[in-house]
Amino acid sequence: MRHTIDVGLLLSIDGTYQCIGRNALAGATHALQEINANPDYPFTLQVTHINPQGFLHSYSEGAVQLMQAGVRHIFGATTSASRKEIIPDLEQNGSLLWYACPYEGFESSENVLYLGGCPNQTLIPLLRYALQAFGSCAALIGSNYIWGWESNRVAREVLEVAGGTVLLEKYVHLGTTRFS
């Protein structure tokens, strides 16, 4: 007889990151269905999805709700802020976050599996190409948030080593879509 493991999906399907959250939810749901359909596994995964709706405080509330229901494995939290928001709750309850999104690095918790890449892993190859194709002057624009700050720090260092120049460094609110 297969035993059941409760898992949680903490993914916003509304708000700024709804496209990412909806795709992640669809992918996770498909993967969980495949796992549960495989008779070789001695377990099934029982899923509970919480939709924080893109509100930072709702991630912590959702994580606590999942853990109070017995969930010890949580998948999701799209942003660094949402991940950081729930780490104290995870650590207090001995639960594990499976964090698949890119993150800024320089963080370590025994209660988080960091599965996504860091800015240096994508920016360095991109900047090598951009420096050759477009020259050594750049404008660095990012979200006023740890991901934007860290990405621009890496970009600035690469440009400096290459003898390039940062013409502008600007940060905008998360969710900004209009630029003039």
Q: What kind of region is each of these model predictions?
A:
Residues 2-4, 8-29, 50-52:
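Extracytoplasmic "Venus flytrap"
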Residues 14, 78-81, 144-149:
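Gly/Ser/Thr-rich loops at beta-strand to alpha-helix junctions
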Residues 23, 38-105:
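Beta-alpha junction/loop-to-helix N-cap segments that form part of ligand/metal-binding clefts
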Residues 27-41:
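A short, Lys/Arg-enriched amphipathic alpha-helix followed by its capping loop at the start of a domain
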Residues 31-35, 85, 89, 93, ...:
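Alpha-helical structural signal in soluble globular domains
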Residues 37-54, 109-111, 159-176:
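Short beta-strand elements in bilobed, periplasmic/extracellular small-molecule ligand-binding domains
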Residues 95-125:
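Extracellular glycoside hydrolase catalytic/binding regions
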Residues 115-171:
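An alpha-beta-alpha
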